[in-house]
Design a protein with these regions (language model features):
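A cross-family detector of function-defining hotspots
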Residues: 53-100
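Boundary at the C-terminal end of the N-terminal hydrophobic targeting segment
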Residues: 17-21
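A short, surface-exposed interaction/processing loop segment used at functional sites
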Residues: 110-129
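Bacterial N-terminal signal peptides
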Residues: 7-15
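N-terminal secretory signal peptides
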Residues: 22-72
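General secretory precursor processing signal
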Residues: 16, 88, 95, 105, ...
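Broad, structure-driven detector of short, well-ordered beta-strand segments within folded domains
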Residues: 101-111
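Bacterial N-terminal signal peptides that target proteins for export
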Residues: 1-6
Length: 129
């Protein structure tokens, strides 16, 4: 009886863990689309994606969004697939698309040349109404 209760608790904990981790990247394999990897510099990852046919999704071309902080640096380097960056932890979200499939890339870094990939997921940008 005690063993079955422990198994039940273990299965429950595994389920909770999977539920919270499930939205990250397709089980966050070591290599993502186009062979990108966690910790890879954004510039290198983007080059791989574009070479494999992923197209940057322009995020703020017509909505009057005002870039600030590291967002300005990304925009200056023509990374218009940038959705947003946080102010407190320098995490940024960028979007790409290929043959109807969306790709979200999350990065971290306060300087353009030091920005690295932290995760990816098959997620489309939210549409504004």
């Amino acid at each position: 009886m005690k063993a079955s209760a422990l198994v039940l608790v273990a299965v429950y904990c595994m389920g909770i863990s999977e539920a919270f981790a499930g939205g990250s990247q397709a089980s966050n394999d070591k290599h993502g689309p186009a062979g990108i990897v966690i910790g890879e510099r954004l510039v290198a990852a983007r080059a791989k994606l574009v070479k494999q046919g992923w197209k940057p999704t322009p995020m703020h071309a017509t909505d009057g969004y005002v870039y600030s902080g590291v967002e300005k640096e990304l925009a200056a380097h023509k990374f218009f697939e940038l959705d947003t960056c946080s102010f407190d932890s320098s995490r940024c979200i960028l979007y790409y698309a290929k043959k109807g499939t969306c790709l979200r890339i999350d990065t971290r870094g306060e300087q353009f040349n030091a920005m690295t990939v932290t995760r990816w997921t098959r997620e489309c940008p939210e549409t504004t109404q």
